């Protein structure tokens, strides 16, 4: 109570902060007469002038007022649009690395030009991040006119660009791209073998459009680059056949987590079924020998019970295509991980694609935290303000609207079941349709949108259905959703980023209707006609009440509901919004309290009758807050676990960069060889032990295997007081001499290139294996809680130990290959590094399978002078193909290179 009184008297902290920016807005306005008097050439010359001022020691804040005034005037001349004062406030907020919450239609795209231009003046690159390729292209084209006017270059990253095109786009002053393209390019860059092959340049400043969608909704879904493993189609099909016969009373399903647990009777039934199918080793399902088949069982249960066709995925052209739970869009090319996608393929009887092993991975949380400065824009961020600050250290600032909002938000209506609810929705839509009022209906799934479509067909209402099946036309359909009598059904927030303008979108109509009309009088007349028609139609729509937004059920997040409401009432237009709910809605069914069900079911609510209740609305809000809190906890957990991997990832990637930048890595190789010798001697001759306790034969064998040399160990033991340190020093000297002899027999330049190639390949190989090990650890570490231990602390401790073991394995691996391989090299000019294969990219929830740390030692200390990396098999590392040719090695024997693979799958491929 007292808080609300104080807020009324003094305003909120947000109001006070926005008011404090008025001084800067006035400074910007003071420069307007000056820039308005400049010619086009003089206005463009402001850019080199500002850059000179920065070179002389001025800061971006120093030149902000004049720079913003310059952009405002250039926008008037190049785009025909002038920034409002509230948009100037938004630009200042973005420049300061904060989130500007701006309502739909307030011109976020134009606001971004202010901060983008100012920060691009430093020449370090500015990334503007969008949610889809269409918006990246659109904004780069439309705003590119302004930037080019001011002498800045603009690039856009979209799929199917080659590496040279990507590099050129990243080197532009301003780069538009989707979050996925940026993340995957970063991962691919860190799998390459030469600095010149990389496309990214150092991180500087990013502005994220629809920041809540990218940094909140997709925060649980890591970007993954993976490569294929062995085919297990038969196992998936066999397990799926058994799962389809399991009765519902033999398992318990948790719809919140999408996990399935077999009952005791269920375990016994599955054991018998698996035994009959020849899938069980022994008689106990949970014996260690059955770990793999239990994993397949879990995924098959999840696929058959929890994942619904046309809700979680669709079958298109014989393939399983994931549906984005937030937008309803098809996620072509994305696959669930850990065998879930294969389990769904087996369920639907389509071709089962091989599983993939993770080669590189990163979450958006850790990707975007690499930027020294990051800002964001959205229409809905206030409800997630604590999370933005906790994880990204970004404040949310609500920017005032240029014109007061006139939209009317009506109270929710509750019905007993879906059919009653949809009947009422269809009736309201028909009334508004007959009145000419445009209607936008938001649904949560393809299934619901098609069900409502059937209702509207019976009512005789013409309408457009916008869902994952037809997302190619998404922007065009949404853009015209404000036309007279238009009825549009959209899954969730499809079409986000495209304004719904009352009367229709002039630019889209020009594009559609005048596509084939060349420049000239006829086209000019057509444009004038369209503008007049849109203006006339807008007046009719305004008279009909503006855009009517209907929600068919509440989303898990209040923010998503607010996004739907926000499509109506843009720039002071009238409008209304209303949500229809029923007991069968997912939110009420899964998360609603039992008392809600009891009171509703026991009420005398007749079929088709609706009720409105503050108690029910409060219960819905409570359920939403509960889900929001759960999802936030999941995202925080993702950050905690990924931070452990992220620390290790940064070390590995820094090591790769140092290796690629170095002209020679001989010192690194020598340090690794010496460390390997120390480890071998340390294992055989533990500190504090007596010579009688040393494992002499093991030491001989290990030296022979890893270093390829024989040592006079028996003679050394005849000496008095021989110490492990002395043995280490002597073995190092022998190994160094052996390596020096090998180096003198080959071309020096080619040898240096080979050393770098082997370092990178071994580093990449072991890093890939390490990722798989960490993933397996993460899946089971939660069980430590039963032993009264904290899972995250256990994970940190074990992950660090695994990382140290990986580094030891890399040192030994590189040493073995260089010391024991018989290598024939051509001169360096003929030496070609291997090309990066085309790996599969995916973006999958690590907890549900849905689409949706202790600091390490400094990098240079890991391997000595420089750091190491990981790589796959040595294909391409040896220009002459197989260095072991002619040695009579069996094709099924382990490859002498030490990769752990069979010879026929490694160097034997070349033979």
Swiss-Prot record:
Cellular component annotations (GO), alphabetically ordered: cell envelope Sec protein transport complex; cytosol; plasma membrane
GO biological-process terms attached to the record: intracellular protein transmembrane transport; protein import; protein targeting; protein transport by the Sec complex
InterPro entries per UniProt: Helicase_ATP-bd (IPR014001), Helicase_C-like (IPR001650), P-loop_NTPase (IPR027417), SEC_C_motif (IPR004027), SecA (IPR000185), SecA_CS (IPR020937), SecA_DEAD (IPR011115), SecA_motor_DEAD (IPR014018)
Keywords: ATP-binding, Cell inner membrane, Cell membrane, Cytoplasm, Membrane, Metal-binding, Nucleotide-binding, Protein transport, Translocase, Translocation, Transport, Zinc
Reaction catalysis annotation: ATP + H2O + cellular proteinSide 1 = ADP + phosphate + cellular proteinSide 2
Molecular-function GO terms, alphabetical: ATP binding; metal ion binding; protein-exporting ATPase activity
Primary residence: membrane
Compartment(s): Cell inner membrane; Cytoplasm
Chain positions recorded as ATP binding sites: 87, 105-109, 499
Cofactor: Zn(2+)
Protein EC: 7.4.2.8
Cofactor binding, note field: May bind 1 zinc ion per subunit.
Membrane-protein topology: Peripheral membrane protein
SMART domains for this protein: SecA_DEAD, SecA_PP_bind
Residues annotated for Zn(2+) binding in this entry: 895, 897, 906-907
Family: Belongs to the SecA family.
Role according to the record: Part of the Sec protein translocase complex. Interacts with the SecYEG preprotein conducting channel. Has a central role in coupling the hydrolysis of ATP to the transfer of proteins into and across the cell membrane, serving both as a receptor for the preprotein-SecB complex and as an ATP-driven molecular motor driving the stepwise translocation of polypeptide chains across the membrane.
Record-linked NCBIfam families: PRK12904.1, secA
Assembly and binders: Monomer and homodimer. Part of the essential Sec protein translocation apparatus which comprises SecA, SecYEG and auxiliary proteins SecDF-YajC and YidC.
PANTHER family, per the entry: CHLOROPLAST PROTEIN-TRANSPORTING ATPASE, SECA INNER MEMBRANE COMPONENT OF SEC PROTEIN SECRETION SYSTEM
HAMAP family membership: SecA (MF_01382)
Protein's recorded name: Protein translocase subunit SecA
């Amino acid at each position: 109570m007292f808080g609300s009184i104080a807020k009324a008297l003094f305003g909120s902290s947000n109001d006070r902060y926005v008011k404090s920016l008025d001084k800067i807005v006035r400074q910007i306005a003071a420069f307007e007469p000056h820039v308005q008097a400049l010619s086009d050439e003089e206005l463009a010359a402001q850019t080199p002038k500002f850059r000179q001022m920065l070179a002389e020691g001025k800061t971006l804040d120093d030149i902000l007022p004049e720079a913003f005034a310059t952009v405002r005037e250039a926008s008037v001349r190049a785009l025909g649009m002038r920034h409002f004062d509230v948009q100037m406030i938004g630009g200042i907020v973005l420049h300061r690395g904060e989130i500007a919450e701006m309502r739909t239609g307030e011109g976020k795209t134009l606001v971004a030009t202010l901060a983008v231009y100012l920060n691009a003046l430093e020449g370090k690159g500015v990334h503007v991040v969008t949610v889809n390729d269409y918006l990246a292209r659109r904004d780069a084209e439309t705003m590119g006119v302004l930037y080019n006017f001011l002498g800045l270059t603009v690039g856009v990253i979209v799929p199917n660009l080659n590496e040279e095109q990507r590099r050129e786009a990243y080197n532009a002053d301003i780069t538009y791209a989707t979050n996925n393209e940026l993340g995957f390019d970063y991962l691919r860059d860190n799998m390459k073998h030469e600095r010149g092959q990389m496309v990214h340049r150092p991180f500087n400043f990013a502005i994220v459009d629809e920041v809540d969608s990218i940094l909140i909704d997709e925060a649980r879904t890591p970007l993954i680059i993976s490569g294929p493993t062995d085919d297990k189609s038969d196992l998936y099909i066999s397990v799926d056949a058994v799962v389809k016969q399991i009765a519902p009373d033999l398992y318990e399903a948790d719809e919140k987590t999408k996990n399935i647990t077999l009952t005791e009777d269920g375990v016994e039934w599955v054991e018998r079924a698996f035994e009959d199918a020849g899938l069980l080793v022994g008689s106990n399902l949970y014996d260690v020998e059955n770990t793999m088949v239990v994993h397949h069982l879990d995924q098959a249960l999840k696929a058959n019970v929890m994942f619904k066709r046309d809700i979680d995925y669709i079958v298109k052209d014989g393939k399983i295509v994931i549906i984005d739970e937030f937008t309803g869009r098809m996620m072509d090319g994305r696959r669930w991980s850990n065998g879930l996608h294969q389990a769904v393929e087996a369920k639907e009887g389509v071709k089962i694609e091989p599983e993939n092993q993770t080669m590189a991975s990163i979450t958006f949380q850790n990707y975007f935290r690499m930027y020294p400065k990051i800002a964001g824009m959205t229409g809905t961020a206030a409800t997630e303000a604590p999370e933005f600050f906790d994880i990204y250290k970004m404040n949310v600032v609500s920017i005032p609207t240029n014109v007061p909002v006139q939209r009317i938000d009506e109270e929710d209506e509750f019905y007993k079941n879906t059919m009653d609810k949809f009947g009422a929705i269809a009736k309201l839509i028909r009334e508004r349709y007959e009145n000419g009022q445009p209607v936008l209906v938001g649904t949560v799934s393809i299934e619901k949108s098609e069900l409502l479509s059937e209702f509207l067909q019976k009512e005789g209402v013409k309408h457009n259905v916008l869902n994952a099946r037809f997302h190619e036309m998404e922007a065009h359909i949404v853009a015209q959703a404000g036309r007279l009598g238009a009825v549009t059904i959209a899954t969730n927030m499809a079409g986000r980023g495209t304004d719904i303008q009352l009367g229709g979108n002039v630019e889209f109509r020009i594009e559609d209707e005048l596509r084939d009309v060349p420049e000239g009088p006829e086209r000019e007349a057509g444009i004038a006609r369209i503008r007049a028609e849109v203006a006339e139609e807008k007046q009719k729509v305004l008279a009909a009440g503006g855009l009517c937004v209907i929600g068919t059920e509440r989303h898990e997040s209040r923010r998503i509901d607010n996004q739907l409401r926000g499509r109506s009432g843009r720039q002071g237009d009238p409008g209304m919004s209303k949500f229809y709910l029923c007991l069968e809605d997912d939110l009420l069914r899964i998360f609603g309290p039992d008392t809600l069900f009891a009171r509703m079911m026991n009420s005398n609510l007749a079929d088709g009758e609706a009720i409105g209740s503050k108690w029910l609305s409060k219960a819905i809000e409570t359920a939403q807050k509960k889900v929001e809190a759960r999802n936030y906890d999941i995202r925080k957990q993702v950050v905690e676990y990924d931070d452990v991997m992220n620390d290790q990832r940064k070390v590995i990637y820094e090591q790769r960069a140092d290796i690629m930048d170095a002209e020679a890595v001989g010192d690194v190789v020598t340090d690794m060889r010496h460390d390997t010798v120390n480890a071998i001697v340390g294992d055989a001759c533990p500190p504090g032990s007596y010579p009688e306790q040393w494992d002499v034969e093991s030491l001989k064998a290990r030296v022979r295997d890893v270093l390829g040399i024989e040592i006079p160990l028996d003679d050394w033991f005849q000496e008095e007081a021989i110490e492990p340190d002395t043995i280490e020093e002597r073995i190092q000297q022998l190994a160094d001499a052996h390596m020096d002899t090998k180096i003198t027999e080959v071309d020096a330049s080619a040898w240096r290139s080979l050393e770098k190639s082997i370092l990178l390949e071994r580093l990449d190989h072991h890093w890939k294996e390490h990722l798989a090990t960490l993933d397996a650890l993460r899946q089971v570490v939660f069980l430590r809680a039963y032993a009264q231990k904290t899972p995250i602390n256990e994970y940190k401790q074990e992950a660090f130990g695994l990382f140290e073991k990986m580094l030891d394995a890399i040192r030994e691996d590189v040493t073995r290959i260089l010391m024991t391989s018989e290598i024939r090299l051509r001169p360096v000019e003929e030496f070609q590094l291997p090309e990066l294969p085309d790996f599969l990219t995916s973006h999958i929830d690590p907890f549900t399978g849905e689409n949706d740390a202790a600091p390490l030692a400094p990098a240079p200390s890991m391997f000595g002078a420089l750091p190491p990396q990981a790589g796959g098999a040595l294909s391409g590392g040896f220009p002459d193909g197989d260095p072991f040719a002619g040695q009579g090695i069996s094709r099924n024997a382990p490859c002498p290179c030490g990769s752990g693979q069979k010879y026929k799958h490694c160097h034997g491929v070349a033979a």
